[in-house]
């Protein structure tokens, strides 16, 4: 409805001029262009075309017109009006003041027609256009400021708007091929109509793989074209952390209220999604007048956008490369997660899928850690003074505790009856028997001191798994939990942080972003109580044993000592597949290696751990 904002200067004897102005603005606003044209001096077909095209050229989603002052001098009058146009881009409307002249015609008044009636300064043959300049997506950086997203080939799919014969058909078929919703297809129509006719209008960016998959279908979209460019978008040195980008509007983006335009590259997971708004910034939008030849005549309105902000992470590309190299020769699926033991900063996250086995999720996976978890009951027993490295603890075979039978998997050779030897060889039955010395609360408390189940968060989507252990309800359950089976579930990240406890003396919540910063512990949570120094000292000595003379001897390296513990457990949901672990630290870097295998041998994880430790940069 036309808003009347004060009519002034109209003679009392002739109020019809105000009625003519109101009728013209109302017809124009409502899209009744024939009625509007009949109230002008112009050729009806020309006026109708001008009014209709000006609206479509802007891709407008709404128009509101309001009357302003009117002055009358004899047989002529000058009317001012206010226009507010919704450009459909989630930003403020374009508002301006226009004016036109009216001439007395018989008993009424007609608008003296020219293109300038629509917008002041619009001349014959001119057209309106909306230019949107999207700032380049800002990078995700490693701890030294190097980009985690290397340049890679990218396909920009778009149109030359002046060559599109049917924008609706083009947008509808593009939406069908790429999965855009019908409402988004309508926005694409608006983009095509509003853009300069001769410039390439990018509608969507695709990775080479995605383009190859869709190319046949895209080839059937009328008037569509594409070009190859190089962008930092679709490849990543750390995909588990950075996440993926694409053009889909995810539910989370809608819930977050992030500005989204069809074809815009958005983060779909990981840090790319969590920091979508920061990385993309906001576009610069201009409403311009262009000549018939496509040259820009003037800028009518400009909304200046803002560049995005780079996000700096804790990732160390040298450590990441060491993890990837260590996994590259593995014939099975596996993963490596490394953290700075003294801070919890995540240094590397790598995974490798092979051997027809499922992928290992280094952050959100939920796995039983097997004997690698024995560092937890060991710390609990050392804290209470119930055992020491030289305690006489036989490696039973088999063991029956709390009505449950336990055996050593893989088999353990005949050992000296000393706890340090049991630990070095990951003797499961020694720990199931030692469960008799623990009450259920002591084991779950110790697990919490290693960060298992402690509420923390990272700015990643989906959120990583924090680990879990239920309070055992019986001696048999305590025994099963003591060897990392039973109710114990962890991710590789959880166990890397647990290894960091032994190296640094206390647990630190993980962090992945240093700028902009954010909390890692959930509100109101406190850090776990740290172990006493003598407990950590004894635990370190015990963790030297597996590599020096125990189940992980294959990981022995010259130079700085490598500490660790191994483990194996069935892969949840895959009884014939085992998870094989090495959890340890060297030179301030704590890490966890997980490999899937169809055997119970520790070697796959041990050999990856050896290579990773060897490839680590000198500290």
Feature roles, as predicted:
Residues 2-28, 33, 507:
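C-terminal region of N-terminal signal peptides and the immediate post-cleavage residues
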Residues 11, 23, 38-39, 86-89, ...:
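Second-shell loop/turn segments in exported
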Residues 12, 16-19, 30-80:
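Short solvent-exposed beta->alpha transition segments
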Residues 82, 95, 103, 110-114, ...:
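Small/polar-residue-rich segments within soluble enzyme cores
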Residues 97-104, 581:
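Hydrophobic/aromatic beta-strand elements that line small-molecule binding cavities or substrate pockets
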Residues 117-134, 139, 148-159, 164-168, ...:
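Short pre-catalytic segments that frame enzyme active sites
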Residues 290-300, 333-370, 380-597, 601, ...:
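Beta-lactam-recognizing serine transpeptidase/beta-lactamase-like catalytic domain environment
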Residues 523, 606-619:
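Short, gly/Ser/Thr-rich active-site loops of penicillin-recognizing serine hydrolases
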